[in-house]
């Protein structure tokens, strides 16, 4: 191995295996693109995005950590969401949850 070398595994990397998946269609009704990161509490995403926020409560995008999904104006996008794990506490963000999801 060479210092700094990256050795890739064969095949795709599995993530969020066995997690309950919620599928939603999201429409960006705003006039500018909106990007949502992998671990952002999706129910609190930009208010310009039109989707079932109640179904998204306590969930995040089912994408690789550190990535994001970009929503262009007027274009519907189907997304998959998985439940937030760990302590399931959502501090700050847009202030709509502000604490424990399961309280």
Swiss-Prot record:
One of its GO terms (cellular component) is urease complex. The keyword Cytoplasm applies. Keywords: Cytoplasm, Hydrolase. It catalyses: urea + 2 H2O + H(+) = hydrogencarbonate + 2 NH4(+). Its EC number is 3.5.1.5. GO terms for biological process: urea catabolic process. It is found in: Cytoplasm. The keyword Nucleotide-binding does not apply. Pathway: Nitrogen metabolism; urea degradation; CO(2) and NH(3) from urea (urease route): step 1/1. InterPro entries: Urease_beta-like, Urease_betasu_sf, Urease_subunit. One of its GO terms (molecular function) is urease activity. It is an enzyme of class 3 (hydrolase). Transmembrane segments: none annotated. Heterotrimer of UreA (gamma), UreB (beta) and UreC (alpha) subunits. Three heterotrimers associate to form the active enzyme. Belongs to the urease beta subunit family. This is Urease subunit beta. It comes from Streptomyces avermitilis (strain ATCC 31267 / DSM 46492 / JCM 5070 / NBRC 14893 / NCIMB 12804 / NRRL 8165 / MA-4680).
């Amino acid at each position: 191995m060479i210092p700094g070398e990256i050795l890739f595994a064969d095949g795709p990397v599995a993530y969020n295996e066995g997690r309950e998946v919620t599928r939603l269609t999201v429409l960006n009704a705003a006039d500018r693109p909106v990007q949502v990161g992998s671990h952002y509490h999706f129910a609190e995403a930009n208010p310009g995005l039109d989707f079932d926020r109640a179904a998204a409560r306590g969930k995040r995008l089912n994408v690789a950590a550190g990535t994001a999904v970009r929503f262009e104006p007027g274009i519907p996008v189907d997304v998959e969401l998985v439940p937030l794990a760990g302590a399931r506490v959502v501090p700050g963000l847009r202030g709509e949850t502000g604490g424990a999801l399961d309280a």
